[in-house]
Amino acid sequence: MTSIWSIWLEPPPGGVLEQRSGEFIRAQSARLKPHGASGAFAPHVTLVGGFECTLEEARRGAVQLAADLARIPVAPFMDVTKGGRFHQCVYMRVEPNDQLATAHAIAAEAFGVKAGNGGGSPYMPHLSLVYGDVPESEKDACVAEATAQLCGDAEIVSGWEATNVSLWRTDVGDATCESWERVELVPLRKCGLVKWARFYEDFIQRTQPP
């Protein structure tokens, strides 16, 4: 039996970012539910998502991916903004960096997903705060509130260094997010920039047309 899966980078449990962003997500999901928001979800930055396979295939892929990746800087956060997609409604943008972009490209290749943010646009790392089809006025209010509550805290804005990847079952048809579940948490390799450079060079060589 197959499911829809995602690979997430989650902030350290119990840290300021995880606690404060989680509280904000839960509060806004409840407040905006009458306006088309989804249920609450765990704070995360999606490394790659929307791939379909069996549980065993997903687990095997996540373990191999973690073995191929170094620790990933998910930092800093630039601002809070809004978007036009259900799963990119209101979110905090992460400043792109080579390691994060390379990790996304490697993950996309591993799970057979087209790299990027869709429509030919590049990967846009972000931490979602609201999912849903929410009126623009409510999005604007949420952006302002998140900016005031989250972006003024240096411990939040500074982001984190991802030391693991998490495998989540994410049925995108479930607007409540109640069926979403984490099924695996896999530590990343502890290697530095030299190995990252090799990963990047190897990836470019594999993906360049002949």
Language-model regions, residue ranges each:
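Short acidic/glycine-enriched loop/turn segments that link adjacent beta-strands
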Residues: 86-88
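A structural signal for short secondary-structure junctions
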Residues: 158-160
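Short beta-strand segments and strand-loop junctions that repeat across beta-rich extracellular domains
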Residues: 163-177
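Basic, often amphipathic N-terminal segments
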Residues: 1-77, 82, 94-156, 174-210
